[in-house]
Every structure is written in structure tokens, then in C-alpha cells.
Design a protein with these regions (language model features):
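Conserved BB-loop
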Residues: 30-34, 52-73
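Short, conserved loop/helix-junction motifs that constitute active-site signature segments
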Residues: 8-10, 47-48, 118-123, 176-180
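Short coil/turn segments at beta-strand junctions that form active-site/ligand-binding loops
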Residues: 12-13, 90-93, 182
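Short aromatic-enriched loop/helix-cap "lid" or pocket-rim segments at secondary-structure transitions
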Residues: 28-30, 66-68, 137-144, 195-201, ...
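Serine-dependent carboxylesterase/thioesterase catalytic core
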Residues: 19-20, 63-65, 71-175
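Short, surface-exposed "cap/lid" segments of acyl-processing enzymes
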Residues: 2-50
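Alpha/beta-hydrolase-fold catalytic nucleophile elbow
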Residues: 56, 130-131, 220
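C-terminal catalytic-base region of ester-bond hydrolases, centering on the histidine
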Residues: 22-23, 52, 61-64, 89, ...
Length: 298
């Protein structure tokens, strides 16, 4: 999804947002009580007029009755192809990734090197991880426990805590970050979501030297939805972009207009599955109902 500045052929760089499990290109980043173009992706577009701001959407549902998902390897190939189609990788770029999205970005960079498509990895100057479970999440196991009543997707299976493929991916990232020259910024949640800490501090830490994860007093859902331009996450991401894309902050002209494409599919999806949720909930224990409500709001 094109947010701002993407049609500018002379732009100096790109910033790509990548959502996580159960999210989409719009609702993951947008406060739920607001339904307009005034949110932090467009704020960044106004702060950095010479950058393209993008949001990548992909199928990453937790339950099969909500939709489909693909293995991380296939999602990574899909993201790499999308970047090539949009001519992203010809300029310096930064990724901002939430939860599963952070694993997807790491796997995409790994895939780019494996298949000799190194332009993207060479142009990647930094990654901001927002509550990314580098070694998996115990929530995935809890979700899987109710799989008899609500079949889970492959994305849930791959997110289980201490999964071997996640450890291997994180080891690859740690070993290759110095040679790739990729700066890393890490934020992690401190508040539970529906009583569950989705990504604990240990899993949120990729284990990089000179990278200190920053605790944020938000939950797994709200950490990626800054409500103001004075929020810590927004200011931190803005400074990170300015530093690693080496672009000056600019003020928008008074007559500037947003080029954001609205996407409210998440609201429609929830309306369509409400009957299914009620049917499933009748057969769940209290803790399983809590987990189901959590996943519905990711």
C-alpha cells in the first residue's frame, strides 16, 4: 500500500512498514477509535517529504476460519517479489516491523542473499522491531491448544517459543548484521494484552551487541499505534529514519494533501466472522476465550 511520496521518482529513500500476525497494512498501525488519514504513517510522510512511505500487507491469520496464511519462507519470497515490482531496493530503505513482521523481514533478507538478489539487503540501512518474538512466543502454544475447535494456520506453528527455525534465523541475523551494515532498533511491550504478555523481553531481544532493547508501557497491540507525534515510539522511529537515511526533516507546504489509500477491510472482516466467534466461544474455557479475544484484536 502506498502511503506517501511513493510516486516521487526522485525520492531519496523508502520506509516500509510490515505488520504481524492477524494484522493488515492499515489497521495494525492505526488507532482503533480513529478512522481517518491522520496517523503516524502519514505523519512521517509529512516529516520526510523526500521519502516514500509504504505499508506491506500479506495473509497472516491465526485461525483458518479467519483467512489463510503461508509459511515464513514463502511469505519472504512474496515480500521480496513485491519490493522488486515496486522498484524498492534501488534507494536506501528502512523497515519498521511489528511482531511476526520482524521475522518476515529477517527471512526476506536471508532469502535475498541466498538467491543472489542482494540489492535489497545492500540498500537496507536499518530495521525497527516492534515487539518481535525473535525466539518465538508462548502465545502461539496457547492458541494451538484451542486448535481442535478453531484450526490454526502455519503462521501460529512457526511462532512457537524456542522453535528451531527461529533460533537459526536469529543466529543468521546476528552474524550478518555487521557485514550488511544494518542498524537495529528494538522496542518491546511491558503491558499484557487480555492478561497475556505476548512477547516477553527475552524473546524481543535479538541479542545484538550495542543494541539495547527499549521497554514501552504499551501492550502488544498498542505499541505499534502511537496516538500522538509526541509518543516515544513515533519520536524514536523518526530519529532513526533521520539518522540512518541521512535525510533532513522538512515541513509540509500549507496546501499539501495526503496520498494515503484508505483500507478498512479489518472492520469488515470482523463483522463477517462474528457469528463464527460466538459459536466457537460457547465451547471454550475462560482462558481460551481470553486468548481468542486477544487474537481477534491483533
Amino acid at each position: 500500500m502506498k502511503i506517501s511520496g511513493c510516486e516521487n521518482a526522485s525520492r531519496s529513500g523508502d520506509v516500509i512498514f510490515v505488520h504481524g500476525l492477524g494484522g493488515n497494512a492499515w489497521s495494525t498501525w492505526h488507532p482503533k477509535e480513529l478512522y481517518d488519514d491522520n496517523f503516524w504513517l502519514t505523519w512521517l510522510g509529512k516529516d520526510f517529504l523526500d521519502l516514500g512511505i509504504w505499508s506491506f500487507g500479506y495473509a497472516a491469520e491465526a485461525f483458518e476460519w479467519k483467512g489463510t496464511s503461508m509459511p515464513l519462507f514463502d511469505q519472504a519470497s512474496n515480500l521480496l517479489d513485491w519490493l522488486e515490482i515496486c522498484d524498492i531496493g534501488q534507494r536506501p530503505l528502512i523497515f519498521v516491523a511489528h511482531s511476526l513482521g520482524g521475522l518476515l523481514v529477517k527471512k526476506m533478507l536471508n532469502t535475498a542473499q541466498t538467491f543472489s538478489k542482494q540489492a535489497v539487503s545492500e540498500q537496507t540501512k536499518g530495521i525497527v522491531f516492534l515487539a518481535t518474538p525473535h525466539t518465538g512466543s508462548h502465545l502461539a502454544k496457547l492458541i494451538d491448544n484451542i486448535g481442535i475447535l478453531a484450526r490454526t494456520t502455519v503462521s501460529v506453528d512457526e511462532l512457537k517459543a524456542h522453535a528451531p527455525q527461529l533460533r537459526e534465523l536469529n543466529e543468521w541475523y546476528r552474524e550478518n548484521v555487521p557485514s550488511l551494515g544494518i542498524a537495529t532498533k528494538v522496542y518491546y511491550e511491558m503491558q499484557p494484552t487480555q492478561g497475556i504478555l505476548v512477547v516477553d523481553p527475552d524473546s524481543a531481544n535479538p541479542g545484538l551487541q550495542r543494541v539495547k532493547p527499549v521497554a514501552i508501557s504499551d501492550n502488544h497491540i498498542s505499541i505499534c499505534k502511537p496516538k500522538s507525534q509526541e509518543s516515544q515510539v513515533y519520536l524514536g522511529v523518526k530519529k532513526f529514519i533521520q539518522e540512518y537515511l541521512r535525510t533532513p526533516l522538512e515541513l509540509p507546504p500549507s496546501d499539501s494533501t495526503s496520498t494515503t489509500v484508505r483500507n478498512f477491510t479489518k472492520v469488515a472482516e470482523k463483522a463477517l466472522v462474528i457469528n463464527q466467534v460466538e459459536g466457537i466461544s460457547a465451547e471454550l474455557t475462560p482462558i481460551e476465550k481470553k486468548i481468542l479475544r486477544l487474537v481477534m484484536n491483533l
